[in-house]
From Swiss-Prot:
Official protein name in the record: Aspartate--tRNA(Asp/Asn) ligase
Organism: Chlamydia caviae (strain ATCC VR-813 / DSM 19441 / 03DC25 / GPIC) (Chlamydophila caviae)
Location relative to the cell: Cytoplasm
One CC-aspect GO term: cytoplasm
Function of the protein: Aspartyl-tRNA synthetase with relaxed tRNA specificity since it is able to aspartylate not only its cognate tRNA(Asp) but also tRNA(Asn). Reaction proceeds in two steps: L-aspartate is first activated by ATP to form Asp-AMP and then transferred to the acceptor end of tRNA(Asp/Asn).
């Protein structure tokens, strides 16, 4: 049996009179007084099928029994629709197929939610449980097809640039990379475990040691971490590494890759992309992931704050904190109620409160008006280039809290006041990150321990490691980090030094990274790399609310697969085979 001669989007007036066969799902079903209409849907489109009781009574009885989402194969003749009955919204809207034979290929149970009315809101957990039905609603499939085209464009471009796609192992060794590993017990080596890769980091660097020169891979990675809207326990990244190159060699390649990926959707990206250091981003936007679609840049107000008799300002200055904020053009229309909402909002991020100062035609209004002279406020307005009807929003807090609070407030106000267009795509390279950070009193890597320090800062490793900058870079799009990379350490002695600063003992270094240090000791070329988060890029490109909307079979925010009911308990015999005992 041949299931189809045409797809459901292909028939047109040029096919009138032809005998055809189409197959698909019953999208909609209508019985209009002895005439049954079926919208038959496949991945490509919809074709209207018609069966008239007075012409084919037995066939009509069979067709009248079908229900939504049954799978049919229909044979019939293409006819022009009656005048006035055309549907301009369908590629096949000028024709219909008069049914002559129908095969019911598969029946469907009662549906947990409507498929034909894809505008109806459906609970996300229900959608994930019945992901295969959710796909039929169209939007998920469209995004998966778009994702395929983006991946295809990526592969074609990387091949032209001389990169070789290499598939690296999924079963590897557990090495500290920041997040928890997913572990796989070994049956052959009792008590030993593989780790699923958080990234192909060490493998791709060893490929450079092996002389591959230019590598890429669309890799699946795994991280056992707390999830957010833009995080999943398994995710895809476009992984890239190249030898004998500097960031200035890499950036144009990645920028053109971005152009190729976005051109799939017909989006034009202007090159070169702007660059900004980590410190500049923190100073101007409070974050290393700035959204550049709108202004509201931060300004340091410490010099002005010294002229206030406001104890919160003076206390922060005495404790080494900061006072900074931004100007909202036309923001003097914010009510006290709205400002109270913003005050409670910034408290979520550790701020004690929000200072607001309105520049009005008849003077100023502020919750700190009595703590400074008119001249001080005028100087502040001038510093912010504030005009009448603008408002200054300030926070006094330790630097990290002020930055985090203002970053979130800035994003919120930008969205609420429609300061940007959702179809804008503003990229920026963020460079020169700190090499180290301090967490819970311990030094840790800002990115990962294989990142090279800037040459001019290497001398500070012994005296002031927290001030050392790294040769690292992130690519940020509309406030999302979509790529991250760095120049790698290619010297075994320097790599050992970094490990020792991270308080890894010689025994621990040998146990976890001995193979890697050994590889670096056999003549390693200077090399660098980057990884682009494919899921996150697709999320931004499609306007999806989260990366679950661009992944075929995603997990929930609790890392559960509701469709397969995973994770799940396994049989006692399997545990015994793996020499594992579950204690709780």
């Amino acid at each position: 049996m041949k299931y189809r001669t045409h797809r459901c989007n292909e028939l047109s007036l040029s096919n009138v009179g032809e005998r055809v066969r189409v197959s698909g799902w019953v999208h909609r079903y209508r019985n209009h007084g002895g005439v049954v209409f079926i919208d038959l849907r496949d991945r490509f489109g919809i074709t209207q099928i018609v069966c008239r009781e007075d012409e084919k009574p037995e066939l009509h009885q069979l067709v009248d029994s079908v229900r939504s989402e049954w799978v049919l194969s229909v044979e019939g003749t293409v006819c022009r629709r009656l005048e006035g009955m055309e549907n301009a919204n369908l590629a096949t809207g000028d024709i219909e197929v008069e049914i002559e034979k129908v095969d019911i290929l598969s029946k469907a149970k009662n549906l947990p939610f409507s498929i034909s009315d894809d505008h109806i809101h459906v609970n996300e957990e229900l959608r994930l449980e019945y992901r295969y039905l959710d796909m039929r609603r169209g939007q998920i499939l469209d995004r998966l097809i778009y994702r395929h085209k983006v991946m295809l464009a990526c592969r074609q471009y990387m091949d032209k640039q001389g990169f070789t796609e290499v598939v690296t192992p999924v079963l590897g060794k557990s090495t500290p990379e920041g997040a928890r590993d997913y572990l796989v017990p070994s049956r052959i080596y009792p008590g030993s475990f593989y780790a699923l890769p958080q990234s192909p980091q060490l493998f791709k660097q060893i490929l450079m040691v092996g002389g591959l020169d230019r590598y890429f891979q669309i890799a699946t990675c795994f991280r056992d971490e707390d999830l957010r809207a833009d995080r999943q326990p398994e995710f895809a990244q476009i992984d890239i590494e190249m030898s004998f190159a500097t960031p200035d060699d890499l950036f144009p390649i990645i920028e053109q890759l971005v152009v190729e990926m976005f051109s799939v959707q017909g989006i034009k990206i202007d090159l070169p992309l702007p660059r900004m250091t980590y410190q500049e981003a923190k100073d101007l936007y409070g974050t290393d992931k700035p959204d550049l679609r709108f202004g509201l840049q931060l300004r340091d107000c410490r010099e002005h704050a010294k002229q206030f008799s406001f104890s919160i300002f003076l206390d922060q200055l005495a404790q080494g904190g900061t006072i900074k904020g931004f100007c909202v053009p036309g923001g003097a229309d914010m009510s006290r109620k709205q400002l109270d909402v913003y005050t409670e909002f910034v408290k979520r991020y550790g701020a004690m409160g929000l200072v607001w100062i309105k520049k009005q035609e008849n003077g100023l209004a502020s919750n700190v008006a009595k703590f400074a002279s008119e001249e001080v406020f005028d100087a502040m307005f001038a510093d912010f280039s504030a005009k009448d009807n603008d408002i200054l929003l300030l926070i006094a807090a330790p630097e990290s809290i002020a930055n985090q609070s203002l970053d979130h407030l800035r994003r919120l106000i930008g969205k609420e006041r429609n300061l940007y267009n959702e179809s804008q795509y503003n990229f920026v390279w963020i460079t020169d990150f700190p090499l180290f950070a301090k967490e819970e009193g311990k030094i840790c890597s800002e990115h990962h321990p294989f990142t090279s320090p800037l040459d001019e800062d290497i001398s500070l490793l012994d005296t002031d490691p927290l001030s050392v900058r790294s040769s690292s870079y992130d690519l940020v799009l509309n406030g999302y980090e979509i790529a991250s990379g760095s120049q790698r350490i290619h010297n075994a002695d320097l790599q050992n030094k970094i490990f020792s600063i991270l308080e890894l003992s010689p025994e621990s270094i040998k146990e976890k990274f001995g193979f890697f240090i050994d590889a670096l000791s056999f003549g390693t070329p200077p090399h660098l790399g980057i990884a682009l988060g494919l899921d996150r890029i697709m999320m931004v490109l499609t306007g999806a609310e989260g990366i679950r909307e661009v992944i075929a079979f995603p997990k929930t925010q609790k890392a559960a697969d509701l469709m397969m009911n995973a994770p799940a308990e396994i049989m006692t015999s399997q545990l015994k085979e793996l020499n594992i005992k579950v204690t709780s």
